[in-house]
């Protein structure tokens, strides 16, 4: 699950609502809320990057008094599609939110240059946590939802972050703006994203702009 972190592009062909098998929201006496679900999407675009075609994206979450813990994954039907598994710990109050996400991708990421000038790549093994070899990316988020506009800032602070042209860690960051609106009797959102400085984590882009109008789930 990527909070505002995963923008899906394309028509959602099927929504696998598991509420018929497992209640989508379970309320205990201590007010703990849990949710489970899955989507089948025709294409997976994340922050302007094409990570695959038709994909299954399950999610699981639990929250209590603004504190939340969630798991989200994506598996494509093609062997070349990116596989992903994320864990997010977050806190929100009013419109304010902060979170830390552990992303894991099965693709290798350029993480630096060694003393011989050779490029260093991260491994794609899940349980590998070496400082310069892990496939995990750790990201911090801070944001505020003003109602007509939500603003979120994300920065990678550890793990398989991208690098700048000089081979130094980029602390890759992303600014996301999201605005809801109504059209044709449906609720929609328009998302605008920007990469503020160069980084191989976003394919070397600087100031990448990405927009994605999409239906908004109001369940």
What feature does the model see in each segment?
Residues 210-219:
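Single conserved hydrophobic/aromatic residue that forms the stacking wall/gate
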Residues 46-54, 74-84, 132-134, 156-172, ...:
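Solvent-exposed loop/turn segments connecting transmembrane beta-strands
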Residues 30-36, 54-56, 65-67, 85, ...:
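Outer-envelope beta-barrel architecture signal
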Residues 28-77:
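Short glycine/proline- and aromatic-enriched beta-strand/turn motifs that initiate or cap beta-hairpins
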Residues 40-44, 64-66, 73-77, 93-95, ...:
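Transmembrane beta-strands of outer-membrane beta-barrel pores
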Residues 1-33:
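Cleavable N-terminal export/targeting peptides
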Residues 81-172:
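Outer-membrane pore/translocation modules
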């Amino acid at each position: 699950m990527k909070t505002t972190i995963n923008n899906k592009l394309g028509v959602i062909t099927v929504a696998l609502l598991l509420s018929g098998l497992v209640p989508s929201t379970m309320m205990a006496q201590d007010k703990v809320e849990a949710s489970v679900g899955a989507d089948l999407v025709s294409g997976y675009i994340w922050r302007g990057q094409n990570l695959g075609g038709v994909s299954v994206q399950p999610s699981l979450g639990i929250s209590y008094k603004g504190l939340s813990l969630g798991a989200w994954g994506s598996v494509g039907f093609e062997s070349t599609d990116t596989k992903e598994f994320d864990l997010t710990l977050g806190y929100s109050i009013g419109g304010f939110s902060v979170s830390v996400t552990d992303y894991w991708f099965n693709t290798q990421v350029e993480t630096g240059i060694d003393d011989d000038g050779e490029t260093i790549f991260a491994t794609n093994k899940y349980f590998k946590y070496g400082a310069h070899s892990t496939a995990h990316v750790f990201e911090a988020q801070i944001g505020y939802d003003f109602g007509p506009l939500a603003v979120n800032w994300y920065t990678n602070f550890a793990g398989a972050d991208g690098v700048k042209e000089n081979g130094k860690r980029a602390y890759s960051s992303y600014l996301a703006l999201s605005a809801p609106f109504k059209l044709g009797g449906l609720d929609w959102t328009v998302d605008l994203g920007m990469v503020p400085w160069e980084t191989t984590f976003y394919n070397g882009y600087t100031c990448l702009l990405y927009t994605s109008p999409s239906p908004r789930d109001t369940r």
